[in-house]
Curated annotation (Swiss-Prot):
Source domain of life: Eukaryota
PROSITE patterns in the record: G_PROTEIN_RECEP_F2_4 (PS50261), GAIN_B (PS50221), PTX_2 (PS51828)
Membrane topology recorded in Swiss-Prot or TrEMBL: Multi-pass membrane protein
Residue ranges constituting the GAIN-B domain according to the UniProt record: 489-649
S-S pairs: C146-C212, C619-C633
Entries under SUPFAM superfamilies matching the protein: Concanavalin A-like lectins/glucanases
Name this polypeptide is given: Adhesion G protein-coupled receptor D2
Length: 963
């Protein structure tokens, strides 16, 4: 082995060889310390390899971040330890070590970006240093201000980071701060002259910090954020009044008058840059985007631009600095040998780690230097006059690789591989794959390279070399290494990581970039184990349609598995969508065909180490059929998005939980509404305006929820998805229209108390069914191509299509809320008068109880038919709690209607009682015991009531469960 393995590696090649064939040799003699702490085992040495229950693990002497440690292990064809160390290894560790995850290859390091920006340098406190925005500000009912600041810790007096003075209000808005020596910087927000307390914002360490302040007129809610975390917040600051219009924004100074009145005492001492101002209060997620160099554009009043400022001459010339865009403070799993427990640390903190292997692949990697293909490695290294391809795949890489060197080495490697006539040997393939992984890993290293690195040239070189090692003549070599590398897709995944790095080279003048080597020569492709529900992938192939096939035996299945590890089923191997904040998940539904099982040849699950494995992150089983399984990834339609007016990105666990709750609640509501509608039809409830309204409401709402439950399966077909969206749009609008009719009818019966006949059911039917037809037709005519949202079957929130539903719903909910409030007032007044008539001097407790019940009762009775449970759906973009509330409230609406307007409704119960009496009478008549025949059989009429349910004895109240 090479020297870089270190002293701890040398004992690996001792005399002993274990039964698995891995040379372990005699371990180092434990060094015993006879101190006060008792005997202690010697710590594991750098480069030492120790046998574990699941294979072998090699201890690296380096301390790296979680992502760098994972990358280092992958370059050596291993992986981070997937479980806590056991046995002797656990007792020999001294520091916490990183622990991997079974889906770790799918995790990527955050792409730190660097950018150059102008900085205002306030190197000393003077009264003549300030930067003023030329244009006045509008009236602000809410605002957010963010900036990067480097505070001068030697100045203890309070200073203004920025201030806004209005014509009649000098202290309209300020953010003030001061530093405690050796402690923290405390900041306070001032709004309309009201001063919040000084609270700790960030450490007084002289470094750059990102500071944000938010404020809302309603309730005077304010919050202070620094470095992505909420530090303070409260209510009551300048509540009820906006920041007046005509305000002047000044950076670095307090204003005692409009645009002036500067003082040395309140002048900023430090550096300030990247100031942004919004006319709304940003959410924590949006503040994270602003901190990550991607400020939201909605409501943005001022984007950092020194050219838009009047800068005093003493601040000129401006200084340019390079800032690193922050990354999330994500935590990664660790194992602590002290308490022998699992924990977590910040992923960017350097920690030691273990690279682990299964026993057989590790034994093969040990023998790699004796494999064929060493001549290619020697030739490339000789031409480069450097170690480009490492003969030993288990050796650690020492020394940094610059982008220029990588580009030059890629050119040499491409030339040698193109001139090679014989198929590439296993040793050379391992070395080439490792070098490509090393080149791709450059993007996760120094953030400065993200702007300066020649990523387009490097990407072209990587794609060219990768194409050469994916040639058909190398298929046998890939098969021989399938347990070591995991198949060609491991190389494809590495190449794909270059795509986000290329975004630094794309501009508005060059919005597209294509890097290609040559066509892979796909023809006659056969897709194994799958079929396509959409023909979008088939269009990428210039050949006949794809025919799904399935293996007939276990032997054929194993052959197919080997085939899958070297063949592709589409010209599109993989695809991703990125924006400025990272990868964007795209919804996808696919079907897996079942394989017929034979009792003589039981199927063996494919090994992930032999290629052809499925990635399951964010995916779940959508449906099970007799011959197939439908799988879904990342997005679906639920109650939470019907009234959602902004796009909300949710995690796969949260999305799956919402989808499950929606489906279960929707099913319960659908069954309850269907039962209610059938009871209205079958029971023979007396006809009335209220009964007609409730029939139409339950029918339309049940139909809409039925289509909502089927929307999951409709996504696979574009036409079906559009049809389901149109049906849901129409039926939900019909349901809300009948909710409005219910409110108008309630107003006429309870509030107006008109003795004149109403407008008639024709007008009600025109409102309930005609208006929704018009709205849906107009929406389809105006937005034929932007009607359906991408990813699920519902209206598009990125266009005005969503307002064709949200607008009418808001109108109905507003009108019904006003009607309900008026009904409650009348009910409370009537209850108060009734209580006084029954008891001239009622006690205080009885009065309070009477008024509370008079308020709660109509709300409980009328809430479901007026649709007020849908109000939570408008707020789902604010917090996940509102999404769950919307799903819960809307799911129980149908059950609530059934309980109040069917199960507990006296008219329905009376109708059912009449039906029962009629059925019993028919049975008795059929038995010949009715009328005169009753005497012959000695069955008196007094027996008949025993077969019937008791009649209600309490009088009907007008607000008690009307039909």
């Amino acid at each position: 082995m090479d020297a870089p393995w270190g002293a701890g590696e040398r004992w690996l090649h001792g005399a002993a060889v274990d039964r698995s064939g891995v040379s372990l040799g005699p371990p180092p003699t434990p060094q015993v310390n006879q101190g006060t702490l008792g005997p202690q085992v010697a710590p594991v040495a750098a480069g030492e390899v120790v046998k574990t229950a699941g294979g072998v693990c090699k201890f690296s002497g380096q301390r790296l971040s979680w992502w760098q440690a994972q990358e280092s292990c992958e370059q050596q064809f291993g992986h981070l330890a997937l479980q806590p160390p056991d046995g002797v290894l656990a007792s020999r560790l001294r520091d916490p070590v990183w622990v991997g995850q079974r889906e770790a290859p799918l995790r990527r390091p955050p792409q730190r970006r660097a950018r150059t920006t102008a900085v205002l340098v306030f190197d000393e406190r003077t009264a003549d240093r300030a930067a003023r925005l030329r244009s006045p500000l509008p009236e602000l009912a809410a605002l957010t201000a963010c900036t990067h600041v480097q505070w001068d810790c030697a100045s203890p007096d309070p200073a203004a980071l920025f201030s806004v003075a209005a014509p009649a209000l000098p202290n309209a808005l300020q953010l003030r701060a001061f530093a405690e020596p050796g402690g923290v910087v405390r900041a306070a927000l001032v709004v309309r002259g009201q001063h919040a307390p000084f609270l700790a914002a960030f450490r007084a360490d002289g470094r750059w910090h990102h500071v944000c302040a938010t404020w809302e007129q309603r309730g005077g809610r304010w919050a202070l954020f620094s470095d992505g975390r909420r530090r303070a917040g409260a209510r009551g600051l300048g509540a009820g009044h906006p920041v007046p219009s005509g305000g002047i924004l000044v950076l670095g100074q307090d204003q005692d008058s409009l645009g002036g009145g500067f003082s040395v005492r309140h002048a900023l001492s430090g550096n300030l840059t990247d100031f942004h101002l919004w006319a709304r209060a940003l959410s924590p997620a949006q503040l994270h985007r602003a901190r990550a160099c991607a400020p939201p554009s909605e409501g943005l009043l001022f984007r950092w631009d020194p050219g838009a400022l009047d800068v005093t001459p003493s601040l000129l010339p401006t200084v340019w600095v390079r800032l690193l865009c922050p990354v999330p403070s994500e935590e990664c799993p660790t194992w602590n040998p002290g308490p022998r427990s699992e924990g977590s640390e910040l992923c960017l903190e350097p920690q030691p780690f273990l690279c682990c292997y299964r026993t057989e692949p590790y034994r093969r990697l040990q023998d790699a230097q004796s494999w064929p293909g060493q001549d290619v490695i020697s030739r490339v290294n000789a031409l480069a006059n450097d170690i480009v391809l490492l003969p030993d795949p288990l050796s650690e890489v020492h020394g940094a690789l610059s982008p220029a060197e990588a580009s030059s080495f890629l050119g040499l490697l491409e030339h040698v591989l193109a001139m090679e006539m014989a198929p590439l040997g296993p040793a050379a393939l391992l070395a080439v794959v490792r070098f490509l992984k090393r080149v791709v890993a450059l993007g996760a290293g120094d953030p400065e390279l993200l702007l300066t690195g020649p990523w387009e040239q490097l990407s072209q070189g990587v794609v060219s070399v990768a194409s050469l090692v994916l040639e058909e003549q190398v298929a046998d070599t890939w098969l021989s290494l399938r347990e070591v590398i995991g198949g060609p897709m491991a190389l494809v995944a590495s190449v794909q990581r270059l795509a986000p790095l290329l975004s630094t080279s794309m501009t508005s003048e060059r919005p597209r970039m294509r890097i290609q080597h040559r066509h892979a020569g796909l023809s006659g492709v056969t897709v194994i184990h799958s079929w396509f529900t959409s023909r979008v992938f088939q269009h990428t192939l210039e050949g006949p349609d794809l025919e799904p096939q399935a293996p007939a035996s276990s032997e054929e299945a194993n052959r197919v598995q080997r085939f899958l590890s070297t063949q592709v089923g589409s010209a599109i191997i993989s695809s991703e969508v990125w924006d400025v904040t990272g990868e964007v998940n795209v919804a996808m539904t696919f079907h897996l065909q079942h394989r017929a099982q034979s009792p003589l040849f039981p199927p063996h699950p494919p090994s992930p180490y032999t290629g052809g494995a499925w990635a399951t992150t964010g995916c779940s089983v959508a449906a099970l059929y007799l011959d197939s399984t439908a799988c879904f990834c990342n997005h679906s339609t639920s109650f939470a998005i019907l009234l959602q007016i902004y796009e909300v990105q949710r995690g796969p666990e949260e999305e799956s939980l919402l989808r499950t709750l929606s489906f279960v609640g929707c099913g319960v509501s659908f069954c309850a509404l269907t039962t209610t509608f059938l009871l209205f039809l079958v029971a023979g409830v007396p006809k009335s305006e209220r009964t007609t309204v409730h029939k139409n409401l339950t029918f339309s709402l049940a139909s809409a929820e039925g289509f909502l439950m089927t929307s999951e399966w409709a996504k696979a077909n574009e036409v079906a998805c559009v049809a389901v969206t149109v049906a849901m749009h129409f039926l939900f609008l019909v349901a809300f229209s009948w909710m409005l009719v219910e409110g108008l009818l309630l107003w006429r019966k309870v509030v107006a108390v008109s003795m004149h006949p109403g407008p008639g059911m024709r007008l009600y039917h025109a409102t309930g069914w005609g208006v929704p037809v018009g709205i849906v037709a107009v929406t389809l005519a105006m937005l034929p191509h932007d009607y359906v949202a991408p990813g699920h079957c519902w209206l598009n929130v990125h266009t005005n299509a969503i307002w064709a539903f949200v607008g009418p719903v808001l109108f109905v909910l507003t009108a019904n809320t006003c009607i309900l409030a008026r009904v409650v007032m009348i009910t409370v007044s009537s209850a108060r008068r009734r209580a006084r008539m029954l008891s001239p001097q009622p006690c205080l407790q009885q009065q309070i109880w009477t008024q509370i019940w008079a308020t709660v009762k109509p709300v409980l009775v009328l809430l479901p038919v007026l649709g007020l449970t849908w109000l939570a759906g408008i707020l789902v973009h604010l917090s996940p709690a509102w999404a769950y509330a919307a799903v819960g409230l809307n799911s129980i609406q149908g059950l609530y209607i059934f309980l109040v307007y069917a199960a507990c409704n006296e008219e329905v119960r009376s109708a059912l009682q009449r039906m029962a009496e009629k059925k019993v009478a028919e049975v008795l008549r059929a038995l010949g015991v009715w009328g005169g025949a009753a005497k012959e059989h000695s069955l008196p009429f007094s027996v008949l009531p025993l077969f019937l349910p008791p009649k209600p004895s309490t009088p009907r109240h007008p607000l008690k469960a009307p039909a």
